[in-house]
Amino acid sequence: MGQKIHPTGFRLAVTKNWSSRWYANSKDFPGMLNEDIKVREYLKRKLAHASVGRVLIERPAKNARVTVYSARPGVVIGKKGEDIEQLRTDLQRIMGVPVHVSIEEIRKPEIDAQLIADSIAQQLEKRIMFRRAMKRAMQNAMRLGAQGIKVMSAGRLNGAEIARSEWYREGRVPLHTLRADIDYATSEALTTYGIIGIKVWVYKGDMLDRNEQPVAEEPAADDRRPRRTPGRPDGDKPRTRTVKKVDGAADPAKRVRKAGA
């Protein structure tokens, strides 16, 4: 059921890692999980125009470390670091512990699934044709080195009365291969006709460990036997059949046809 399950959850502890990394006992776990959800909602709302791909939350000892992966780190930091200081203050108020905020730049936003989904959603909200937005995103991803990409939109596409879903794929997207590095993300476009959901799968290559970089697949050598040409395999030469004689065996008796028989 690799086609149905969440690609990231399917690969956790194999080639993917958790987005929240901390341990807690049964008494503190619900509160800390609720804090993580509030932090992610706050960052999504606060940094809506900063092209945030993902957020990593870690809790070493009595502190917290929040890493924001963004394609526009300058927007997150702000002028002379004013915005990041305000961000740190708000996160400390939500989490109740000292928070260290770090910003990581996304080098290739064209192959980041979350940024692709958000970009398509923004274009749909600006009344751009959904097919054009999807195909443009796929072309950019393949040009920047993605091995394959699949994009699906669902809802009242082009303002149709009946909701439907359409998807396009380019290259390979092996969802059932555990070693395949599949980046998956979703987004929503709030249009005048209702919500349109966008799902994006990006195949970046194969990896054997969580800490390894994905490796692009090499095309397999074609070791199949050449196909026979129509007709006889050796041209017009008649086929000959060779019969091996077993040692000690008598020659087969010839059939003699008697006259008058």
UniProtKB/Swiss-Prot annotation:
UniProt region (Disordered), positions on chain: 213-261
Similarity-based family: Belongs to the universal ribosomal protein uS3 family.
Single Gene Ontology BP annotation: translation
Function: Binds the lower part of the 30S subunit head. Binds mRNA in the 70S ribosome, positioning it for translation.
Keywords: Ribonucleoprotein, Ribosomal protein, RNA-binding, rRNA-binding
GO MF annotation list: mRNA binding; rRNA binding; structural constituent of ribosome
Domain KH type-2: 39-107
InterPro entries (alphabetical): KH_dom, KH_dom-like_a/b, KH_dom_type_2, KH_sf_prok-type, Ribosomal_S3_C_sf, Ribosomal_uS3_bac-typ, Ribosomal_uS3_C, Ribosomal_uS3_CS
Quaternary structure and partners: Part of the 30S ribosomal subunit. Forms a tight complex with proteins S10 and S14.
Alphabetized SUPFAM superfamilies for the sequence: Prokaryotic type KH domain (KH-domain type II), Ribosomal protein S3 C-terminal domain
Name of the protein in question: Small ribosomal subunit protein uS3
Protein species of origin: Dechloromonas aromatica (strain RCB)
The keyword DNA-binding is assigned to this record: no
Gene name of the record: rpsC
Gene3D superfamilies associated with the record: 3.30.300.20, Ribosomal protein S3, C-terminal domain
Gene Ontology CC annotation, any one: cytosolic small ribosomal subunit
Biased composition (Basic and acidic residues): 221-254
